[in-house]
């Protein structure tokens, strides 16, 4: 029981550190798609419904991702909260997938994938395009096989 609490505390701390790393990097150098989506938000007068309708008729395959990117580009603090949750969910299955070293995946993600890797498109679009889907995938696999 104590080991389990320590593991959850560990992945929570790693999740917070990772989200803060992205947030700080984003504040220092907002680049790429993120700045473009801030302009889209102004263009649509921060009306997410109009943006969604426009994207649906122009590029519907990216509607969900671009809507999330627009929302998080405007509301960065919400992005930090959701990215902590997404990173936590990304690391949660590591206890089941690598029982001997459950802390290793979190450590490797934090060390091997630094925030500077995501500077071309911006922190928020990259997180929405890659970390969120990976989190959902591992979350679904974890709960699919958790009873086994």
Residue map of PLM features:
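Membrane-interfacial loop-to-transmembrane alpha-helix junctions, especially the N-terminal start
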Residues: 6-9, 97-105, 148
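Start-transfer (signal-anchor) and selected internal transmembrane alpha helices
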Residues: 1-18
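Extracytoplasmic loop-helix module adjacent to an early transmembrane segment
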Residues: 17-57, 69-70
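Transmembrane-helix motifs of polytopic, lipid-linked glycan transferases
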Residues: 84-103, 139
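Membrane-water interface at transmembrane helix exits
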Residues: 69, 73, 95, 99, ...
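Short hydrophobic/aromatic helix or loop-helix immediately within or flanking a transmembrane segment
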Residues: 54-85
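Alpha-helical transmembrane segments of polytopic membrane proteins
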Residues: 77-87, 126-134
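Membrane-interface micro-motifs in multi-pass membrane enzymes
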Residues: 102-145
């Amino acid at each position: 029981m104590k080991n389990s609490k320590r593991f959850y505390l560990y992945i929570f701390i790693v999740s917070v550190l990772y989200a803060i790393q992205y947030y700080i990097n984003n504040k220092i150098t907002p680049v790429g798609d993120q700045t473009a989506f801030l302009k889209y938000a102004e263009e649509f007068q921060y009306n997410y419904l109009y943006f969604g309708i426009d994207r649906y008729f122009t590029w519907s395959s990216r509607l969900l991702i671009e809507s999330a990117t627009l929302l998080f580009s405007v509301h960065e603090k919400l992005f930090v909260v959701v990215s902590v949750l997404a990173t936590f969910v990304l690391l949660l299955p590591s206890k089941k997938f690598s029982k001997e070293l459950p802390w290793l995946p979190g450590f490797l993600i934090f060390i091997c994938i630094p925030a500077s890797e995501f500077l071309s498109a911006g922190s928020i679009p990259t997180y929405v395009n890659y970390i969120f889907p990976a989190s959902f995938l591992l979350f679904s696999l974890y709960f699919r096989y958790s009873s086994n």
